[in-house]
Structure formats: C-alpha cells, structure tokens
Amino acid sequence: MSGYIPISGADEPLPGLEKYESQTQVDSTKLHYVEKFVDDCLQCGAIVVFVASPHYSIIDSAYYAPLADLARRRGLTFLNYHGNGLFTDRPEYFHDPTHLNSRGAERFSEIFAADLRRIVSPAGE
C-alpha cells in the first residue's frame, strides 16, 4: 500500500521540543535543481508553493533560509508550519517528533487547505 496511512495518538508522551541547528553548508547542486524545477513549473504556468510541514521541534531562523530566499527571489509563497505554535504547542497532534498522528494530520490538512485556497483563488477572482 502506498500513500498516507493514518497514525493514531502518540505511542508514548513526547519529550520536550527538540532543537535543530541549521546546516552550515547548503548543497549547491540540490539547490540548483530545485531552482531549475521551479523555473520549469513557472514556465508551464503552475502556481508553485513551498511548504514546510509541522514538526515537534524548535529550529533556528537559518534552517529554512535557502528555501525562503529562493521563494522570495522567485516571488513564490513559502508556507512554514514547522515552527508554527499551532503545532509546537500541541504535542497530542504528533505520533513522534517528525510525524503527525491522524488528529494532527486532519488539523494540518484543514489549515493548509485554507491557506492554499487563498493562494490559488485570491479574493475577488
């Protein structure tokens, strides 16, 4: 079976929030191909949105800087739910620090869908 498999509540209480440090070096080859992929999508008329899904962790501000910078340079939207208090304040939404459980996935899907609707169909269109 492939695709999403729901995970019920956390198997055990989650520890405190984990701290992730940003990488000191970005892989320039990977970044080049992400940029090429974005450019190809834009040439075809696609709406490109970068998304960082929720994790039960704390990150420093530089963690997503390369992605945020690329989004800014290309005029794209970057939806960063990783450090979003809606999720980091709710350990009951997580199966483990990197995976939402079914309750968290449902809540994230509601929020993400609403945000995506605003991007794809701005008011007045």
Regions found by a protein language model. Name each.
Residues 1-44:
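Secreted/periplasmic serine-hydrolase-like ester/acetyl group-modifying domain
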Residues 21-23, 51-53, 97:
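A short, structure-level motif marking secondary-structure boundaries and short turns
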Residues 7-9, 14, 60, 90, ...:
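Serine/threonine-rich low-complexity intrinsically disordered regions
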Residues 35-59:
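Active-site segments of SGNH/GDSL-like serine hydrolases
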Residues 5-7, 47, 58-59, 111, ...:
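Weak global preference for isoleucine
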Residues 24-30, 54-63:
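Acidic-and-aromatic substrate-binding clefts and catalytic sites of carbohydrate-active enzymes
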Residues 36, 63-66:
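A short acidic, amphipathic alpha-helical/loop segment
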Residues 65-125:
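C-terminal regions of proteins
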